[in-house]
Swiss-Prot record:
Gene Ontology biological process: 1-deoxy-D-xylulose 5-phosphate biosynthetic process; isopentenyl diphosphate biosynthetic process, methylerythritol 4-phosphate pathway; terpenoid biosynthetic process; thiamine biosynthetic process
The protein's annotated pathway: Metabolic intermediate biosynthesis; 1-deoxy-D-xylulose 5-phosphate biosynthesis; 1-deoxy-D-xylulose 5-phosphate from D-glyceraldehyde 3-phosphate and pyruvate: step 1/1
Role, per record: Catalyzes the acyloin condensation reaction between C atoms 2 and 3 of pyruvate and glyceraldehyde 3-phosphate to yield 1-deoxy-D-xylulose-5-phosphate (DXP).
Protein name per Swiss-Prot or TrEMBL: 1-deoxy-D-xylulose-5-phosphate synthase
Transmembrane segments: none
Top-level taxonomic group: Bacteria
Organism for this UniProt entry: Chromohalobacter salexigens (strain ATCC BAA-138 / DSM 3043 / CIP 106854 / NCIMB 13768 / 1H11)
Family: Belongs to the transketolase family. DXPS subfamily.
Subunit structure: Homodimer.
GO molecular function: 1-deoxy-D-xylulose-5-phosphate synthase activity; magnesium ion binding; thiamine pyrophosphate binding
Lineage summary: Bacteria, Pseudomonadati, Pseudomonadota, Gammaproteobacteria, Oceanospirillales
Cross-referenced SUPFAM superfamilies: Thiamin diphosphate-binding fold (THDP-binding), TK C-terminal domain-like
Cofactor note: Binds 1 Mg(2+) ion per subunit.
Stretches for region Disordered: 309-343
One GO CC annotation: cytosol
Amino acid sequence: MKLFDEIPAERPATPLLDTCEHPAALHDFNATQLRQLADELRAYLLYSVGCTGGHFGAGLGVVELTVALHHILDTPYDRLVWDVGHQAYPHKILTGRREQMSTIRQFGGLAAFPKRDESPYDTFGVGHSSTSISAALGMALAARTKGERRRVCAVIGDGALSAGMAFEALAHAGHVDANMLVILNDNEMSISENVGGMASYLARILVSKPYTVMRENSKRVLSHLPGALELARRTEEHVKGMVSPATLFEEMGFNYIGPIDGHDLPTLVQTLGNMANLEGPQFLHIKTCKGRGFRPAEADPIGYHAITKLEKTTSEPPPKKEPRSPNAATAEPEAQPKPQPKPRKYCNVFGEWICDMAAVDARLIGITPAMREGSDLIRFSREYPERYYDVAIAEQHAVTLAAGMACEAMKPVVAIYSTFLQRGYDQLIHDVAVQALDVTFAIDRAGVVGEDGPTHHGALDLSFLRCIPGMIVLAPADEAECRAMLSAAYHHPGPAAVRYPRGTGPGTQVASNLEALPIGEAETRRSGREGGVALLAFGSMNGPAGEVAERLDATHLNMRSVKPLDREAILAAARDHRLLVTLEESVVAGGAGSGVNELLAAEGVQVEVLNLGLPDDFVEHGKPAELLAACGLDAEGIETAVRRRLETSRADD
């Protein structure tokens, strides 16, 4: 295997890979050719992701597995399902999309994850974790029903295996004796370090004290018996089978093999070739290294989970700053430009707030489902380890865990991405809201998130949160409001959510205090022409709303609170303006604008309303600015929509 210390600056020579337009080309490759193909695939993957940015470490770790699977299986007739999809870049390259990799995660280009309408080789669309075994089982049972002899394989990581859904599928597959192969890609990592009983079980079982004591005592006894020690060595693997991961999976009805080296290509090919044709549920456990072949990624698998295209780098340290010239020291202070503060990421605002609040309230508990880094809980986890819980990829459990803590007068804060809260929705309703429990939800990645596409956009949360009785829903316009709203939600005696977008805010100065913003009170940011237009903006839409208000001499209200709405502000706007325009970075159906419509209808107020938000569709991948423009939610799109409505209204008068 070729190892790399830096990402290739030029496209590497890949003569064998260039001949593989489809996976069928791999079927006749010998062992030498497969090894060459794997090396070329890894080199091309490094170059490609270095040019575009994207998910990095996971794909490098499954190069050999991907080559072996497409060598053995007759895809797409045989079904191959990748869990999550972070590791699917090598699969995309081998399935006819090599020349399109330069467009991955870009507007109009290849998707970040497997996608059914992108390629027949992508048998199941993914993005969230732990769905692969259920989907593959469905395909296997459908093949049985139709009398088709097709092989079905699911590839799942050890992080995704921590979710209950994966075990539900394993139990069912064993019960119905399905013809399918499950491959556990065990790299001891998910996005953050793996936690939970399963990760600990897989890691510790063969080095546990009872097992090692039994083994050493047996060796001492058997060493006095001729030939017995050699016999013990030969039977040790059978003893391991009594206490190894095989115990768990074989009790579920699977034939367990492993663990084997997931980078040993000949062993992979031989093992997969044997297992793929066996009847019944098969389970192959492979051990891999995330970032394999690129030394910096092997050393820092979390940091190299994904990279940007600017990180074409190396293991070398950053360049040193040039020393200041002697003349610079004598320059007048007034001559130096005053550095502008960099806009802060919303997740960093949350990370600082939760540490500050924890310092003054010992009841605060921080909970996250495997998103410590993304939610910026690293500092909190270190300063308050006894009050920090990473529950792994278990969103349902995270929400109900918080509910249980709230029952005991604790103050849990659940840090979760908008798209992943969808997985804990029943628990949010049944376990938190019905009981009016005091749980705060810090909802990150609200609205369009960019290159990861429709499975990761936070487009639905305003709609599914607003309809829950007793729920408080707040949407900050900037970093300062985000901190103040987190305090407001935390002090509210019931379920409350603050939803904020990915990335940086507009650069507003953030206070260091913990003062709360009043709930349900809008802010008038601009008073426009009476009888004209009023823009009612929620959250991130206050940015473009400010621009449009200036162009149209319109009133601009920062609504702040999605639920409850500021009744008085809305009624006043309806009284003084001919057109109300609601703006939200969420789907219109059931969202904040719908709430305004419902309030006006309940009050019997007749005024023209234009609701602008994300479309009734799944928004594709691309840069957030591109996506918002495509949805008509940039300043130009909003202005055009408002002017068009005004022209239509005048024509009807």
